[in-house]
């Protein structure tokens, strides 16, 4: 086993932190993510949101915690302050965006920083919530980028102002969009609710202030998610061209189906996932608290 002095741990932890925090991404290293999502095709955004962002949080669990347990505990206040600021800041920023993809990109930053709060609570509940929320975010964010891909294929613009009244032309699309909007704001019965609730309970054991700030971010998340859904789906048809929109094709519907199943199954039966995580999380915490 590796053994580093306290000073070595601090230095090496910061080096690892620089790379993992950029990947998560944490404030202020988050600026690349909205730009990447805007430039990427739909498939690229789905892979980025569903898989690649999780490599940052996985890096902390797999490398930073076991290799540098002292430094991980030492720098917890730094991570808490950065993550809590990011949750509120990116939620407020998302409300001001005009590009559909940018809105979802900023929500991704907010949710992944909530995961960081759960990880650095260093208790079983917080870590289980963080891992569950990582999985949930993979389903929900990927589906929301697919939702935007569906309307972009038909209208070839991502500007919010050109959409409205799609419920009249695309009822099935509206139902699917509603499911994932509710999941994005952590409605009970969806996967995000379990993950975010466990994160807040775990964080409450360590720091009530951070828990309050994280919960504020969740409230703001409800604001921009419902605003976006209402803006695209309800109201009058903005242009005559929108009347030519067709509802989801079979191909598109079957792409959404496994994501709907994963989101609802994880929300109703989280213990299937929690039981698998329990032993490994306890082993990880034993290594950290041994310090």
Task: Locate each region found by the language model.
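Cytoplasmic/organellar membrane-interface segments at the starts of transmembrane helices
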Residues: 170, 226-291
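Hydrophobic transmembrane alpha-helices and their helix-loop junctions in integral membrane proteins
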Residues: 1-197, 201-226, 230
């Amino acid at each position: 086993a590796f053994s580093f002095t306290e000073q070595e741990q601090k230095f090496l932890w910061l080096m690892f932190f620089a790379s993992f925090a950029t990947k998560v991404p944490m404030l202020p290293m988050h600026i690349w993510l909205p730009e990447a999502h805007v430039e990427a095709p739909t498939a690229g955004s789905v892979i980025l949101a569903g898989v690649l962002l999780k490599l940052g949080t996985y890096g902390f669990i797999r490398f930073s915690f076991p290799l540098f347990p002292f430094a991980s505990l030492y720098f917890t206040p730094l991570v808490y302050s950065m993550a809590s600021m990011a949750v509120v800041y990116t939620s407020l920023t998302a409300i001001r965006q005009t590009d559909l993809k940018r809105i979802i990109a900023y929500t991704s930053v907010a949710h992944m920083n909530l995961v960081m709060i759960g990880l650095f609570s260093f208790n079983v509940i917080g870590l289980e919530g963080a891992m569950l929320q990582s999985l949930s975010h993979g389903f929900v964010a990927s589906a929301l980028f697919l939702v935007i891909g569906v309307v972009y294929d038909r209208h070839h613009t991502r500007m919010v102002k050109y959409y409205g009244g799609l419920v009249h032309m695309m009822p099935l699309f509206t139902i699917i969009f509603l499911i994932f909007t509710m999941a994005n704001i952590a409605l009970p019965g969806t996967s995000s609710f379990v993950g975010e609730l466990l994160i807040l309970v775990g964080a409450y054991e360590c720091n009530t202030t951070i828990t309050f700030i994280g919960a504020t971010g969740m409230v703001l998340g409800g604001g921009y998610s419902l605003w976006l859904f209402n803006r695209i789906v309800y109201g009058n048809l903005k242009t005559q061209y929108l009347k030519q929109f067709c509802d989801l094709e079979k191909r598109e519907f079957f792409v959404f189906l496994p994501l709907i199943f994963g989101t609802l199954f994880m929300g109703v039966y989280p213990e299937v996932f929690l039981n698998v995580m329990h032993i490994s999380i306890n082993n990880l915490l034993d290594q950290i608290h041994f310090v």
